Every structure is written in C-alpha cells, then in structure tokens.
Amino acid sequence: MSKLRWNEVCVLWNGEAFDCGTRLCCKTAYAGLILNLSRDGGSGEEPPSRDALFWKRLKEELPELDLKAREVLRNAFPGENIAALPLTELALDQDESYGVFALGYDTGETLAGRLYLFVPFDEGFQLCGEPICELC
C-alpha cells in the first residue's frame, strides 16, 4: 500500500491543511468539534511515515480508540469529568513517549497555559504508556 502525501491525508479525513510551526497540520470535523491532525516536520509533499491503510484504519477506529483513551484518563484522573473533555488532537511522529500516535484532549486554560492530556498508542493501535500532560 502506498504512502499518502499530507494533502492526501487531509482529503481522506475531509480536512483542511494549515501551518502550525514545524508541524504539518490538518483540521477536520469529529464529533461535532474540530480535530487537529498533526505530524512532525517535513513538507506536505513528503509522505508521512505511515501508509494509506494506516490512515484509513485510524479514521475507522477513531471512535473506539477515543473510548479506550478516555478509560485510561478516567483511571489516571479519577476525580475529573473525562467524558466532558473534547478530543481535539491526533498527533503523529512526535517523539517516542507519544507512541506511533496519540489522542489529545483539551482540558482548558490553567494559570500556566492551556493543558492537554495525550494518550499514546502503538503500531497495533494498542495503548502504550501513561497519559502525557502538555502545556501550550
């Protein structure tokens, strides 16, 4: 199966590419909100490290992966209303702690900045690691 260029990934996800620093980004609708897909560096013409089957599977299994990630977050943060957190990020090729990809949830503004919780997944779409807290 061939690798898709970033603009082809955006078409597959019915999204729109945009610049976000050193990352390639694409915004698309998911669950009535905006989901940002992003991957590290390169250019939109350079194929991502994943093939078309990966992207199609990711799109098809996203609702199930979202449920798995929320369960991890519920266990890690038992006092929080995880169901209310919007899934806003799907990050790929970030670094090893983020697995092959990670789902990111926007918890809102804090005194230190906007806080996101990321849940990493491996090549087999299995959970792989602890949640990651990231301030932006």
Spans of features found by a protein language model:
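A diffuse structural propensity rather than consistent per-protein peaks
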Residues: 5, 47-48, 83-86
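N-terminal trafficking/processing presequences and adjacent post-cleavage segments
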Residues: 25-77
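Generic N-terminal initiation segments characterized by hydrophobic and/or small/turn-forming residues
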Residues: 9, 21, 30-34, 70, ...
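N-terminal leader/targeting segments
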Residues: 1-33, 37-41
